[in-house]
Amino acid sequence: MKLLKRLVSVFAIVLAVGSNAFAGDEVRIVIDEGVDGARPIAVVPFVGSAPEDISKIVADDLRNSGKFNPIAVSQMPQRPTSAAEVNPEAWSNIGIDAIVIGQVVPSGNGYSITYQLIDTVGASGTPGTVLMQNSYTVTNKWLRYGAHTVSDEVFEKLTAIRGAFRTRIAYVVQKNGGSQPYEVRVADYDGYNQFIVNRSAQPIMSPAWSPDGQRLAYVSFENKKSQLVVQDLNSGARKVVASFQGHNGAPAFSPDGSRLAFASSRDGVLNIYVMGANGGTPTQLTSGAGNNTEPAWSPDGNSILFTSDRSGSPQVYRMDASGGSATAVGGRGSAQISADGKTLVMINGNNNVVKQDLTTGVSEVLSTSFLGESPSLSPNGIMIIYSSTQGLGKVLQLVSADGRFKASLPGSDGQVKFPAWSPYLTK
């Protein structure tokens, strides 16, 4: 199967934003806490040479999920290049029940990536059985995407959970100086292949993805007032969809992409509104005392979570998507529900990222970073990205949903904040 056509169709949004520029200073993952309790796995160095280290990218992806703990190359009992060369007992003796082997070789104007996932303990029947294999042809530009594809397939085969390593993150960078220091950027989930969506002399806040991954909504102050902008990532076209009196902020697309929930103080008090994704007359959903902000849709689109200080201090509430009475959920703010509707992620009163099982009500603290903000879930619910304060600046943090793996994605050219994880971008 060839990736090239699929890559061009899926990621044309990156190439077609004519007014955008690629940013030189990318955010990159720096490990803060490892995954000692995760399932050990081996990703054997791929045979061949390419501008990107395919096996390392695959190993890093699996590690970042918190589900796997790839062993170091120095710990590998052998380095097979084919399934026939695998000695299952050598691997099972050190506690490895699955290994990934592969090759990367020049092919035309790009490279051919081939891999095999091998069972070393006979869980599938016989030790040495090939659980999955595939081959892709990619251009140099898409080598990392090809590696992430391997990761997605291996991850799904071993966990029965769809991989999310070919997704992207949007975030805001406040650069250290310059005439337009505020930028909305998009990058691969691990910080590579970063590009600038928009830059401004005035603050930019709260990017939010449309469910098809083709648009970003965000808050812009470029006209000396807060307004909501929706930008098409394919054409670069921007449209101001809300510029009401007072503050307009915290946009959130509905699951079907047809509506936009947001917060506005157009009537003097900050309340939650919903309007069409292209603008129009908004419908007010909240009322009464207190400020209401940070709306987030449930996966089925039937309810909305939001943050309100109506009880005297900020707390997360849940209401019907058409408005009406609201029920307190807990936490302090920035709530988001996983795509399966089972888990709630939010910020608690100590500014830590917590997850709450919506069936049992049990909560678990995932981060103890200073002043955690804006948590955003990967579309499979396995990883969470958020911003925190380090020193005098803001950085992005990555944590697996089980809390095993923690990493930082510091920016080298400014403060990084307001992360938003994309939906699945493959077809």
UniProtKB/Swiss-Prot annotation:
Effect of V14I: In strain: 1479
Disulfide bond residue pairs: none
Mutation effect (A160G): In strain: 1479
Top-level taxon of origin: Bacteria
Function as written in the Swiss-Prot or TrEMBL entry: Part of the Tol-Pal system, which plays a role in outer membrane invagination during cell division and is important for maintaining outer membrane integrity.
Membership in a protein family: Belongs to the TolB family.
Protein name as it appears in the record: Tol-Pal system protein TolB
